[in-house]
A protein has these predicted regions:
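Catalytic, metal-anchored helix/loop core of enzyme active sites in primary metabolism
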Residues: 99-114, 124-125
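Short glycine/threonine-rich loop-to-helix capping motif typified by GTGT followed
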Residues: 75-78, 104-111, 143-151
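Accessory alpha-helical/coil subdomains and C-terminal extensions
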Residues: 3-90
Length: 168
């Protein structure tokens, strides 16, 4: 909403050194024009093409969601490249970093914490060891700690396709 009211391009960097799941989810939710991720070899040519397409469609206010571990560089390098290619665009940079972990929990956050806490205690009573309780596909599961530490959430390419459609 702020981008629309001020006719600006916002580059928003979120956590995601190794995986772009947060950036992809946030990009989808916000209707971001582009989502720049560590898993994808995003290029400046693609980014600039998205911006040119937005200009051609008279879309003057946009958001570009950036995961911190992307291949284009840090958010300030990306902003500099955009400013060089599009000097008339007012580019603003926001780095959320660990700020995004803060804030008051939502109802869903509280329910999830209660359910996972219940299952953690249930697991202890049942003799589960070296596991954590978590949700996968709306089901509570026990995941080995080793897996929780070493595995990453895989991006759903369909999510990126939907995000691209909604951005136009």
């Amino acid at each position: 909403d702020t981008a629309s009211s001020h006719n600006r391009l916002f580059l928003v960097e979120v956590m995601g050194r190794d995986t772009g799941y947060i950036a992809a989810s946030t990009g989808l939710a916000t209707g971001a024009l582009s989502i720049i991720l560590p898993e994808k070899n995003n290029t400046y040519e693609e980014l600039f093409a998205d911006l040119r397409s937005a200009q051609a469609n008279k879309k003057t206010s946009n958001i570009i969601m950036v995961a911190e571990g992307n291949h284009l560089g840090d958010i300030f390098e990306i902003a500099s490249a955009v400013r060089s290619e599009f000097p008339s665009i007012d580019v603003k940079v926001t780095t959320l970093g660990h700020t995004q972990r803060g804030g008051s929990p939502s109802t869903n956050d509280r329910i999830l914490a209660s359910v996972l806490g219940h299952y953690a205690i249930k697991g202890l009573i049942e003799g589960q060891e070296k596991v954590m309780s978590g949700m996968i596909n709306q089901k509570v599961v026990f995941t080995p700690l080793e897996d929780a530490i070493t595995k990453t959430t895989e991006l759903d390419d369909e999510m990126l396709t939907i995000a691209k459609i909604l951005a136009t």
